[in-house]
Amino acid sequence: MFQKVEGIVIRTTDYGETNKIVTIFSRELGKVSAMARGAKKPKSRLASVSQLMTHGHFLIQMGSGLGTLQQGEIISTMKEIREDIFLTAYASFIVELTDKATEDKKHNPYLFEMLYQTLHYMCEGVDPEVLSLIYQTKMLPVLGMRPYFDTCAICHQETDFVAFSVREGGFLCSRHAEQDQYRIPVGEAVHKLLRLFYHFDLHRLGNVSVKDSTKKQMRLVLNTYYDEYCGIYLKSRRFLEQLDKFQI
């Protein structure tokens, strides 16, 4: 059976001397993998469509196991991302998180649209770190994780938030922050932005400017929470941390 899908390449794996296994997150089927025979050959008709982060239409011969990529038509190569090491690093984090967080052939058009919109914004020049924070926040419910972003994790009141508790699974107010000695102190902006990112429609994203110190706190909150409850190891996250460390 042949299936035509619109999708974005989120992973490629070399297979033999000339082939690739291409993993595509599609609007119609969710995540699907297919053998792209001869894709490593420079003159192959599949060489360009099998590049990481390529957005296109793909014709796949489906089977009980791994499908076969027959042909593809490029919608966008995301060249702005490919030509910039910082954009490549953040986009790689986004597509790897998508890959690790999803199962094969689980239809999720909402997630496809979120992935596409995030990469599209990145190509348009929106802060890639902010986009990665938004994406990481919005992936929480996809992974079945629902931290307390709206109320204190202990008293469930909407009040002043001064810390984030991984143990309690959310923000803590000033009255209950002392109950977790390992809490992460945060500023008011961290709570407001994480709450906003969790709920708002990504299509409505306008001009966004976030202080470096706030982004650093948000990253710490999200990474610590993911480490505790998700168990996903991302190579791209390590590279991002190295970029930040050496300020390349």
From Swiss-Prot:
Which GO CC terms are listed, alphabetically?
bacterial nucleoid
Q: Does the keyword DNA damage apply?
A: yes
| Pfam families, sorted | RecO_C, RecO_N
A Gene Ontology biological process term: double-strand break repair
Q: Which UniProt keywords apply?
A: DNA damage, DNA recombination, DNA repair
The free-text function statement in the UniProt record for this protein reads: Involved in DNA repair and RecF pathway recombination.
Q: Which family does it belong to?
A: Belongs to the RecO family.
Write down the PANTHER family for this protein, in alphabetical order: DNA REPAIR PROTEIN RECO
Any idea what this protein is called? DNA repair protein RecO
